[in-house]
């Protein structure tokens, strides 16, 4: 039975792609003048055996993910007209009924418990063409319906955009407790939060290694700021480099180097070293304060904050420290730059004369600025980009307590991904899931 099911899936996948799907395959082009969210129906998922609850949870999270992406108009399942018992083969599906509720796309799935965890068999259809275009068998360890749903949503996004989805990614952040600082991670939508470290000393500025195997943080274990790395494989937490008073470290896009800040006496400069903590050398030598480095996606440039002009502003220089130039000229307090993985924007936090913090983006080439938040609480800060460069996450107090919000790159859609009051700081969006 298992062999027949596997062969059937292989045959369906072969039939669905690439030749069939290439026929007038719809593509969502984000940023195009005629962009509109694609109407999609996510039918009730079928649970096999005792997987009924998991199937329901998986479908709910898939719908929420697709809404969060901003790419889809996810239709309300209460308005569906199709027979819930219809099958998965295209001839058994009454596409006209799905078209009648406005669907262009249709997602269905089977969920079951496998030998090592949950398995999901995702089926995707183009309703107007009346054809099945994608079949994918996905597995996750344990009984984690959320992880299975995130991977299904990633496959749907990949089909329609030809880009990897980001729902299976993780967010790292620092949580302040009573006398403790915790390094935590969570799903990008706020679920599955896990505590990696709990320290009696200050933790700051988490930054992911590009392969997702480690998180770099600033630790005050010794009483002074130092760079430490948390390794997922064995949960080791170790110092990196020999600099004391070092903080704000970030990996280069290829993972080979770390840019960081060192404060020595009255001098605060940027440094760079290899990822194993050796070969450190100074990048800036200026009487001003230089902090908060962030790499361009090609690794050739670094943006940073400096007060060399009299107030904190965003600057850009070569990765070797050469050719520093001022990028921002609006506002008197600009900080926490984060370079988009697409290379076209740098997100940052600005404080105005009312001491209100808001998130902005600036072009690293032209210097053109666009505002992301305005009159949404007194604090919107610490933006971090998703690996696709289309979404960002930041910290806000807009609803009376600290929350994390996911926004698109224009600020048009902003969605809280943590509920209630949470003391999370310095969110850092992790790399694509392997």
Curated annotation (Swiss-Prot):
Subcellular location(s) per record: Periplasm
Keyword Cell cycle: yes
UniProtKB keywords: Cell cycle, Cell division, Periplasm, Signal
GO biological process assignments: cell division; protein import
Gene Ontology, cellular component aspect: periplasmic space
Lineage: Bacteria, Pseudomonadati, Myxococcota, Myxococcia, Myxococcales
Biological source species: Anaeromyxobacter sp. (strain K)
Cystine connections: none
Major place of residence: periplasm
Classification via InterPro entries: 6-blade_b-propeller_TolB-like, PD40, Tol-Pal_TolB, TolB_N
HAMAP family registered for this protein in UniProt: TolB (MF_00671)
UniProt name for this protein: Tol-Pal system protein TolB
Residues annotated as signal peptide: 1-21
Protein family per UniProt: Belongs to the TolB family.
Residue span of region Disordered: 411-434
Pfam families per record: PD40, TolB_N
Keyword Signal attached: yes
Function: Part of the Tol-Pal system, which plays a role in outer membrane invagination during cell division and is important for maintaining outer membrane integrity.
Complex formation: The Tol-Pal system is composed of five core proteins: the inner membrane proteins TolA, TolQ and TolR, the periplasmic protein TolB and the outer membrane protein Pal. They form a network linking the inner and outer membranes and the peptidoglycan layer.
